[in-house]
Design a protein with these regions (language model features):
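Secretory-pathway lumenal glyco-enzymes, predominantly type II signal-anchor Golgi glycosyltransferases
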Residues: 1-287
Length: 287
């Protein structure tokens, strides 16, 4: 009933490893919902938890246990250890590396369409851009961010392997990552469309479509945020703060429901995104 020839061809062409941060207590709820929905369309998925001696021995190959303490204060260490592991074991097998939370929903076909306009052999960093803490800003961790193969290689070899070069624990993980990427000359690239609409959402779809404006979003967003029908790109890529039941509903609406007589125009979306590097901020970001 659905002609998905174009999307299937694209899905095979671009290889993405997805890594999802979670905790043991939500493996059977949030992580399971991710695994049963959008993660099925990743080329490889790893669910990352902090190692805990009290946990049973891991027999599932899609669960990565990293040796860091549990808790939000150690999310930077969790990210650093995960990226080192992925670099050492999977770097040449995949083109792009997506980080998401266990309450993030990703429309993989739309992400791969965006990535088809970029070259994974160049140092590229993508996501929802906030305008604080560095010359270019940083990508929201909850909306999901993406590194090219070249970016990951540079991050680990020129950043994490040099003692003291990059923060490896404490602070906000998404900010720490942005600082390290900037220090090794990995470039921020655009994910907004030609109408100025976002494709990665740091808040829930309800917040962006219905409002009110999430607190602080106008102050923090690199691009002018919009609430309502013009909030988000037609080829939306991610939602944040998605509960497991709504994740299943999104999956059904996107992949099991159609509107009769409506068909996307390939020509109309071919040049939808503003592709290219993002310019540095014209003022000193607050720290």
């Amino acid at each position: 009933m659905i002609d998905d020839t174009v999307s299937k061809k694209l899905m095979k062409k671009i290889r993405i490893l997805c890594w999802v941060t979670t905790v043991p207590g939500t493996l059977e709820s949030k992580a399971r919902a991710v695994n049963n929905t959008w993660a099925k369309r990743c080329d490889k998925t790893l669910f990352v938890i902090a190692d805990d001696p009290s946990l049973p021995e891991n027999t599932q190959e899609d669960i990565l246990r990293v040796k860091v303490p549990n808790g939000r204060n150690h999310l930077t260490a969790k990210t650093v250890q995960t990226l080192k592991y992925i670099h050492n074991h999977y770097l040449t097998q995949y083109d792009w590396f997506l980080k998401a939370d266990d309450d993030t929903y990703i429309v993989m076909e739309n992400l791969k369409f965006l990535l088809s306009h970029y070259n994974h052999r160049k140092p590229i960093y993508l996501g929802h851009l906030f305008k604080k803490y560095s010359k270019y800003g940083y990508m929201s961790g909850g909306a999901g961010y993406v590194l090219s193969r070249k970016a990951l290689r540079m991050l680990v070899k020129k950043g994490y392997r040099i003692p003291g070069k990059c923060r490896e624990d404490g602070g906000d993980e998404d900010v720490a990552l942005a600082h390290c990427l900037q220090s090794v000359n990995v470039h921020v690239h655009s994910t907004i469309d030609k109408f100025g609409r976002e494709s990665f959402l740091p808040f829930s779809g309800f917040a962006h479509v219905y409002g009110p404006m999430p607190p602080g979003l106008e102050e923090w967003d690199r691009n002018v945020p919009k609430i309502g029908s013009e909030c988000c790109s037609q080829l939306l890529i991610s939602f944040h703060y998605v509960k497991p039941d709504f994740m299943l509903m999104l999956e059904h609406l996107l992949y099991r429901t159609s509107v009769y007589g409506r068909k996307i125009s390939e020509e109309g979306v071919k040049n939808l995104f503003n592709i290219g590097p993002v310019k540095p901020l014209t003022y000193s970001p607050k720290r």
